[in-house]
């Protein structure tokens, strides 16, 4: 990595942490009560009223990763219907399940939504609004994952840094990455990938990166973006949520 870039990123995170010191972190899913989540996703809650004050420990779309007091979001895919795993999610300790279908058991906490995919983005945007943590957003036609790994490695030398796992960089993966941020994290490095116009605006709204990195402007996804100018316009929207931040 270019030494000047490494020094800049380290100094930027350090300055942000200094500015935010004393404000309180409020990021261990604090504020993510079932009541707040229901409001964030504009959903319909059913179940015990007292459970609405429960704070979530985690949010997942994979029934194999359900945690005690977590939220299981039952996404219906082309081959797998998450709704079939709702009973098992409760048995594994989930405090609540979310789905587009009506609840089959109204005695358990349950949130019905119009779209689970949109609900994931809405929850991530809400949770991100509670986070006082410097975020580096990375995009580009190629080299995103390598650049993410390098920047995370540099920051990890001084800060407890969360990074995107694998290529969880789309409108499903980014929210799941945001949900992994915990109280001990001091910085986050988020990879953001797109293939069409409009996607970056939605991703940037979720991630709200303090510092943005574009690796390059190539010829990927021209079937949707038209030409390299289209790629440039689409990727440049990474900073739209925080236009005064470093870019």
Residue ranges, per PLM feature:
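N-terminal leader/targeting and accessory segments in enzymes
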Residues: 2, 22-122, 126
């Amino acid at each position: 990595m270019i030494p000047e870039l490494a020094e800049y990123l380290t100094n930027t995170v350090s300055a942000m942490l200094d500015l935010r010191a004393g404000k309180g972190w409020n990021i261990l899913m604090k504020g993510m009560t079932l009541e707040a989540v229901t409001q964030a996703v504009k959903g319909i809650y059913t179940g015990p009223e007292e459970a609405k004050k429960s704070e979530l420990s985690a949010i997942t779309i994979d029934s194999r990763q359900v945690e005690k007091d977590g939220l299981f979001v039952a996404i219906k895919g082309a081959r797998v219907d998450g709704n079939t795993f709702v009973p098992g999610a409760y048995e594994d300790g989930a405090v609540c399940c979310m789905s587009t279908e009506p609840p089959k058991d109204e005695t358990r906490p349950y949130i019905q939504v119009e779209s689970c995919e949109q609900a994931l983005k809405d929850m991530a945007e809400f949770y991100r609004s509670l986070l006082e943590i410097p975020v580096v957003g990375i995009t580009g036609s190629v080299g995103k994952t390598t650049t993410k790994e390098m920047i995370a490695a540099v920051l990890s030398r001084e800060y407890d840094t969360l990074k995107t796992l694998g290529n969880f960089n789309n409108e499903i993966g980014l929210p799941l990455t945001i949900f992994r941020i915990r109280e001990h994290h001091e910085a986050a490095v988020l990879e953001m990938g797109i293939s069409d116009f409009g996607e970056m605006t939605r991703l940037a709204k979720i991630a709200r990166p303090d510092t943005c990195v574009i690796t390059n402007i190539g010829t990927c996804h021209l079937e949707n973006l038209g030409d390299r100018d289209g790629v440039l316009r689409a990727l440049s929207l990474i900073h739209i949520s925080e236009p005064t931040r470093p870019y």
